[in-house]
Amino acid sequence: MIEGTGKGVATDINGSFSLEVKNGQVLTFSSVGYQTQHHVVTPDLKKLDISLRLDVEEIPEVVVVGFGKKQAVKELTGAVSKLDNVADNNSISVDKVLLGRVAGVQGGTISGQPGSTASVRIRGVASVNGRNEPVYVIDGVRVSHGDHAQNTMGNNVLAGLNNDDIESVTILKDAVSTAVYGADTGAGVVIITTKSGKKGAADFHVSSEIGLVSRAAVGEKPLTTEQWLSILYDAYLNSEEGSAAYPSKEALLADLQVGNISAGTGSILQSIYNQRHTHTDWRKLVENNMALSQKINATVSGGNDKLSYYSSLGYLKEDGIVKENSFERVTSSNKIDFQATSKLRLSTNIQLSYANTLAQPEGAQYSNPVYGQYMLRPTERAYNSDGSFNYGQYGMLSNGTYNIAALQQLNHNKNQTIRTLANFQLDYQVAKNLLYKFVFAPEYIDIGEDVYKSPIHGDGFLTKGEADWFNTRIFSFNLQNILSYDLAIKEKNHLSASLIQEAHRIDQKNINAVVLTAGSNKLKTLSSFITPASVSGTRDLNSREGYALTLHYDYDKLFLLDLSGRQDRLSNFWKENRTGYFYSVGLGVDLARLDFFRKTKQLSQLKFSTSYGRVGNMVNASPYATYRYSFNYDNQAAGIPIGVNNPDLHWETLYPLNIGLDVGFFSDRITLSVAYFQKKTKDMIFSLPLSAAQGSYTATKQVNIGEMENKGWELAINAELIKNEEGLNWELGGHISTLSNKITQMYDDTPIKLNLRVLQKGESIGVFYLKKWAGVDPNTGAPLWYKNGKDGETTSVYSEAKEAIQGSYLASLYGGFNTKISYKNISLLAQFAYGFGNKLYDSSASLAKNDGKTTYLYPGYASQVGSYWTPQNRNSENPKPIWDGNALSSEDSTRYLYDGDYLRLQTLKLSYDFPTIWLEGTYLKQLQFYVLGDNLWTYNFDKRFKGDPEAQADGRVDFILPTLRTLSFGMNINF
């Protein structure tokens, strides 16, 4: 910059710049974290080499902690992680960005629907029935998150937040960092800070990106006609009927060719054989040949001493793998910060979003295009000879399934979400060190769902058409009054304290209407149907109020102390138990601040810290919901008991312990963080079933009866390995976490059996409880199970085998690593994620790989071919197929339980920045082109599992829409 003129330029990545100057003018060179240098222009100056020196008073890295307060990382006593560059991937929502990138954070995708939610767990599972997802806070206020839709799959409130508008994400993991938020933070807190304007001239930024979408994992392939028939031949010959009638496959084929089989199950095989020349590829019909993703964002920001502003407008659309499946979004973020007087600052932040989701059914539904790929016969024609869809008879095809290609055109499943989040803030400097802050943040969400089922074919045929309309309206607000005091005593003593009052209220209304019998095939509104089927609505109103006090003290940043206490009152409980008290204490000492270590210069941090506290957890509990009045008895209002009053019902509480070590070398060019954590949950809420004599078959009593523990280690290393004057930079980082989860107390210590799993004292919350598969009898091809559920003696009789604990869906070791290499104008970023020690159960395999039980009806997986027992293949993975099944071989067991160990290349980005000198005269400050890929490569260590190891939330996969792989091309422009 030319001193005294305000005229200046930014250097390119090589340090080159071009600026017209006059003799005698002074050039000023500056950069954040470096000492400013001044050079006088002289007539003989031809070349200027500048090397800025690090500023010993470099601005410290800060993170946002409780209620918008910023704190230097080196002064923390708690477990906090920070993510920058959130937009360096193709994830639509910020919850998916967290997966694999933060120590102690694990989870999975719930659906391959674009814009769907992710399951996020911080340091294990907080509760059996309560909240296991973290609280999300945007710019200091808690917000709604998750899927609030009533019917359609894939709704995600957080998908309404544009990642390009996010400055950073901070993850709070222990008591000292979360207790100030109080009653519902046992599962952690995710703090999202959005971008703000900075002092300077208006800065315009435009980014555009277009990409190709494909499957992240190929998954199981469907059978071809030839493959299906080969299995059916063997299954029929292995049956009593087939083995008695035909001595060989050649004899069977001879009769099939002349159409001689007309009785028994052989007639079914004959009818299928007669259609052997039809080869319908259902996957090809229902999936996109070329799915696309596209987005464009435009922002303007700037400011001066009085006013700063940031405004953005963004558009995004992403197709799913299957047809008629997409997510489309428009977002806008508008932030203004105005210094009204020397003491008064006013801020507004308004975020708007509109999202339109076109969903497809998931799970074991005939209308699910993924389910149909395996269940529909390849011998069934999708189209008639005239080009119209084949609708079969009575609304279904020959095996009772639906033409999924037709349903994608006939039916629709739409979801429209409007979200408004406003944040109005006032800061007033009461005295020199005393600041008052007032925050009012309302949030409004409107979700409209429109489900239409055609009367022509499929699940709307029997009802002559169906229309389901749902509406969800959520209005909430957050009110805060905060008084903060900061004081420095004799330079080395620093004290800060905050007194906080917070109120939060959420009002949610759900309304739905179902009508049947369409008046016309072309009219799809409710008023176009003849028969009203049902109308219902609910309202949930929850409020809470809390008071908190926080205190931070440090002596020369050497000794650190954090204290907090909070009182919360929640409407979920009776008055006697509505009040909860939460606290935390954190201690730390940074030995690198001692004179002895300062002299070495190599050690920049050596901090030991520990924290402990008591935090709460939210449960959808209602101790006073005794009756449900939603039943008709002889045209009179009727109610049934659904619960029993329990005035003793109270908070679930957690007691997190954290012990940490943070080390930095060479001005933090190398950093290492180690932490041990232990999180105990007490007074877990369970719903105990009551006998029918006490109410109804569904009546329960909610009680506090359980305890649980999570513990583990976290290790994170980051290093700036190379940084030289030639423009070569190399950064390398990684993190690894361990987790041990155990239930330590239950009601009467009695195990509770769930679907495929069990809750049992001394075991993990996520353990599978199954019979153990022992393989195939090499002599007979019969299925085998271990009698005791573990090892030793085997049996081919399913009922003789016992169930036993067979592993957990929670990974015991997980993490990620990344590297970034840049040379002059070129940069390469790679991010990996991994997980080990967990199990995945394929619930769909019992239908799609069931050894002839229903194979003649529903073909299933192509992996059946060549993998089952024959006299020539005795050491096989699967039993011999028998028409109508082989000794219950497809019943639940560890046969369909896989190791979830995986390694994935999550993100790969290659970018090129045009040199600044090339942009002279173009009004451009920056021009960058890049290639960005997400989920480009995945390695499953268990070769039997063909699916996506992250496409699960609770260890089960079941015909969900495929997870997405994207490869995008984009550009960034600043002017």
Would you name each region that the model predicts?
Residues 1-333, 338, 345-347, 421, ...:
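Short, small/polar-rich motifs associated with maturation and membrane association
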Residues 133, 329, 335-344, 349-354, ...:
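Extracellular/periplasmic, surface-exposed regions of secreted and cell-surface proteins
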Residues 205-274, 722-809, 840, 849, ...:
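Conserved small-residue
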Residues 271, 570, 835-928, 933:
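Extracytoplasmic gating/loop element in the C-terminal half of outer-membrane beta-barrel translocons
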Residues 277, 353, 358-421, 474, ...:
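Acidic/polar loop-and-plug regions of large Gram-negative outer-membrane beta-barrel proteins
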Residues 808-843:
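Glycine-rich, aromatic-lined ligand/substrate-binding cores of catalytic
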